Each structure stands twice: as C-alpha cells, then as structure tokens.
Design a protein with these regions (language model features):
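Structured C-terminal helix/loop/strand segments within mature extracytoplasmic catalytic/sensor domains
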Residues: 94-122, 212-215, 258-284, 296-353
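Acidic helix-start/capping segments at beta-turn-to-alpha-helix junctions
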Residues: 175-191, 197-203, 214-215
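Hydrophobic topogenic segments
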Residues: 1-99
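Short, well-structured active-site flanking segments
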Residues: 165-182, 268-272
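Short pre-catalytic segments that frame enzyme active sites
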Residues: 95-154, 168
Length: 353
C-alpha cells in the first residue's frame, strides 16, 4: 500500500516535469538510495522504502510516458462512470447491505406484483404482503417496509405457543395455566387461561409463563431452528418480543406462516393443529380465516401494529401480513381494518356479517 502511494507520487511529479528532466529525477532517487544503504540501518527511517520498492519506483520512472489527450479523456470518462455508479448504488448499499434492520430477501426467482395500496394506509407507514399459494405469486405494497424488521409483539405468540407444546410445557389436551392473582390492565387477563383464551385475549403473562418453564436456552434454540426474524433475544427475557431485540419483517412473517400451515418445521402434527385452532378467527362455507394481531407500545403510545394470518378456501390458500407504524394509534386493530378492506377489494375474503 505504501509503495503504491510512492509510485503514485512519482507519477504526479513526472507529469509536471519536462521529458528531459525525467532522468535527473530518477538519478536523484538512485543517489539517495546509495547514501541510505551505507548507513548502519538502511531504510530504518522508512524513507523511500526497501531496495525492492526503490527498484520498482525507478522502473516506473524509466517506463513513464505522459498520457496523450485521448488517454486523458478515456481516463476521465472511466472515472466519471465509476463515480456515477457508486453514487447510484449508494442508497441501496446504505439502506440494505449496511442496514441490518432489513431482511435480505432473494426475490430474483419470485413472481412479484408491486401494488400501490397507499389509500388504505392513509397517514400510516407500513406494508401489506400477500402470498397466493396456488399461483405461487406475491403481491407487495411498499417493498422497503415489507423487508423492514420491527418487533413482532403479540404475533410472536403463535410460535411461542408452538415451542411450549413441542416441549410439553402445555399440551393440546391440557394447556391450563393458573392466574397468579396479580392485577393486570385488561380484565380478561385477570383469570386462569388456556391456550385458546390466552391467544384470543393476547394474554402476555400466559406466554411469559410458558417461556419461564422452557428457559431462555430452549426458546433461543427454537427461534434459531425456525429462523424467526433476526433471531435476537438479547433483550429482557420477559419482553424480548415486545418492542425489544427480536424483530421480523412482513415478508418473513408470511414465509413462516406458510411453514406453519404445511408444517415444514417437522413438529408434532397435533401441536401444529393446536396452534391453528387457537388462531382460527372464522370458519364458514367460504373458507377458514386464521389470524393474530400485535400492538407495540412505547412511552404510552401505540407505534407498531400487526395483523398476520392466512385464509384457506376450497381452491387456494392466501397468506398475508400487514404492518403499520406511526407516532400513535398504530394498533393491531387498525392493521386488521386495513387488511380486511384490502382482502375484500381483492375478492379474497368478505367479512361475514
């Protein structure tokens, strides 16, 4: 690296000299090298480098030719093209490669339709992701937010329940956990719970109790096994999924739901079915609707709303994830309203009155 800098400096000097002065400049370096070599510690001061480096500099001087006008134009053109390319790619580099908060999704082989659904989102930032299983096709609103990882909040309970079932902390036949008597802000939480009731009312303490019996090590092993988002559980063990360290993107939510639906995890079928039953919101002749909301609260404000799930019809299965963000009022309930409007207008699901 240092020798390259010295050669570059020599070249800069030669550009300013007349051709007749090249030899004098080279002789100056040779004389300097000769004097330095006679000292007890040649090149100890680092001036000029070692003899091999000095030889390279002399060869550069001997072979130097001033660039012609055409060469200068070509050089400048190459420089400008390189600069333009670097500047053009800079936003992508800074946003995706250097930004660990985005899911690095290889979408090159995916069938994707980019849809503008901004009228549904209003003032909210966020994304809607839909995967059509039968046609192997994606519909995505706002790709940047579709790959942005944020806290899953209560949507994570789908998988936390599955971990507890797999380890026998709860079972499909007996998922009862007694209320400890502590008073919580929601009346439904102040009672004994089963998986069904805890999922319906999104009872935090139930899933925290499951985690406590599992232990952090086992939970982390499962998070890694299924590839849940950024797999980061460095936050407090009682709240790592609530606006803390664990984060996931809408696209990853949909990918995990497809694995849950067809049990790509290879878990016990009865445990998969127990979770599916717990998140089943509606069943009719039109199909079966599964879903889970999530709301992230920071400093008393709801800033992160989720609604994820899938719809099984007679001839297809659709997986979806909606995430909204704002300084306030970004709730799972509002994410649900947005989702249902989109699904209805897409003729995928019409809410039963």
């Amino acid at each position: 690296m240092r020798n390259d800098r010295e050669v570059a400096c020599d070249t800069s000097v030669l550009k300013m000299l007349e051709e007749d002065d090249y030899a004098d400049y080279g002789n100056t370096l040779i004389n300097f090298a000769e004097k330095i070599s006679l000292t007890p510690f040649p090149f100890a001061a680092g001036l000029g480098g070692n003899m091999k480096q000095m030889k390279r500099r002399i060869i550069n001087i001997v072979s130097y030719e001033k660039p012609t006008f055409i060469k200068r134009v070509k050089g400048m053109t190459a420089f400008m093209l390189t600069a333009v390319l670097l500047l053009g790619f800079a936003p992508f580099i800074s946003t995706y490669a250097a930004d660990g908060s985005h899911y690095q999704w290889d979408s090159s082989s995916e069938n994707i339709s980019y849809v503008d659904l901004s009228t549904y989102f209003g003032e909210y930032e966020g994304s809607f992701v839909l995967y059509d299983l039968e046609n192997d096709a994606w519909s995505i609103h706002d790709m940047e937010h579709a790959t942005l990882r944020v806290a899953p909040n209560s949507t994570y309970k789908i998988y936390d329940a599955l971990f507890g079932l797999e380890e026998g902390v709860i079972t499909p036949e007996n998922s009862f956990i007694a209320w400890n008597g502590e008073t919580y802000p929601f009346e439904a939480w102040n009672a004994d719970q089963t998986l069904q009731s805890a999922m319906n009312s999104s009872v935090n303490w139930y899933f925290q109790a499951v985690d406590e019996q599992l232990g952090a090590s086992d939970v982390y092993s499962y998070v890694q096994e299924i590839g849940y988002g950024n797999e980061n559980m460095s936050g407090d063990f009682s709240s790592y999924w609530m606006e803390s360290s664990l984060e996931i993107s809408p696209i990853e939510q949909v990918e995990l739901l497809t694995k849950l639906q067809n049990n790509s995890f290879g878990f016990a079928p009865e445990n998969i079915n127990a979770v599916k039953d717990a998140i089943c919101l509606s069943a009719s002749d039109a199909g079966t609707f599964y879903g889970k909301t999530g709301t992230g609260r920071v400093d008393g404000q709801d800033v992160n709303g989720w609604f994820i799930g899938y719809i099984e019809t007679a001839d297809n299965t659709y997986f979806f994830a909606t995430n909204i963000g704002a300084d306030s009022d970004a709730t799972g309930g509002n994410a649900t309203e947005i989702t249902m409007s989109i699904l209805s207008d897409m003729n995928i699901w019409v809410s039963q009155k």
